[in-house]
Amino acid sequence: MEPDGDTHVLSRVLAKSSPSVFMPRFSAFLLSLLALGSHGAAVAAVEAKTRPNVLLIVSDDQGFSDFGFTGNPLVKTPVLDRLAAESAVFKNFVVAAACSPTRSALYTGREHLGTGVWGVPPRANLRPDEALMPAFFRAGGYRTFYAGKADTARLPESSPWDRGWDQGYFVSGYQHRDPTLPNRGETLQAKGWTADLVTDLILDFIHAEPGKPWFATAAYIIPHLPWVCDEKFSAPFLAQGLSPDLARCYGSVAQMDAAIGRLLAGVRAAGQADNTVVVFLSDNGMSHKAEADRELAATDWAKRNVHGLRGHKATVWENGIRVPLLVRWPGRIAPGERKQFGAVEDVLPTILDLAGLRSDSVKHLPFAGVSLRPALFDAAVVRERAPAFRIAISGAGSPKPQDESNPRPRRFEDHHLVFRGERFKFHALPGGKSALYDLATDPVESTDAAARFPEIAASMSAALREQWTALLATGRAFATTGPVEPKRGRKK
């Protein structure tokens, strides 16, 4: 069950080194927002009835098996399970192999390599001509807001507020408690659990100017390492006999689930649940580590990776890129599983379609994604979608950080690339080898099916190489954007 809704004035959760200076200025800002809400109330009321609000919720490193509704008997996600029961659920859905690539694709509707993002920082600078999701909503008369993980997309020589967000509180690093929150030149030192603060910030935004449509992103940093949570969430897992590592991991997930529950309850308490499209996804698959230099114990990994998917975060095996997508719009979108194959690039075209916003309202490069609206409104619809092009972010076959300031010709055979389609997935492995997997019968990618489907293997191989060549020809990928990353020695 979602808890009762509650609003939290930001002044109760944010503190600064000089509160006597900061708090009055913020209070004035909040009052100004409330005053604006009364201006043109009749027009705003009409807009609110005809245009849905959009709430985008993104979790961090939450793999396909990290949910109760996908079949994990140990993890506790009652809120997300309920959201799934009320949503269209896409289980044949893929993101990129790591956070920055996924988020750049999410916010641009484009394949991440073409946006200039080819890894995590410092390989994650978006090109300045990329248009981001909130810009389309702002152009359509929406208020826009962001709270949470800072690497939505790194924006050299511009700020997030120049790219479509009216306001945004960006968590620096993985501070699960008492985070630093930059916002329009202010650096705020918040007090409390970050998951709760993200929820509070979004709720304050929702209530600040009633009657005008809004687009908000809640980007939680859970369950990204380090696993740090309130002990009341990890204690039940310890009592069940789970290891401290897994108890903290699942405790973090449970804490985020509770925060999302309060967020959804707040939307409902504001009377806006029926006119709000809620979209939920994770940015990539689960990490195979318990700490930066220590892998999760094999027994814990088996308990977490209950579907036995191959790989992990940063790889292009299924466990690195497959996550569920949830879309809820009460009374408009019927709940239930969708068989349609989708990819993260599809989210932007889809929500613009649902909101009735024109994509040509903002100058942008061509979307790689397509709208999933047909499948949302008719569960029987399964339309052909082009395979998703993906690249490993770390390990064998990944672009190396040192290439950033020492560019050299890129060879197809040096990388681990995949073409992931609705049923078939083609791997171009480093060293020139390849494999084809039939995910309909082999979702764990255990048996090369190229000999059974030689024509499909040949076709996907040629298409993958063609896309790679076309990408390099644009000059947009693998840009020289920063210094060499220092080598990190392993802890003894």
Indicate residue ranges for each PLM-predicted region:
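Bacterial N-terminal signal peptides
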Residues: 27-38
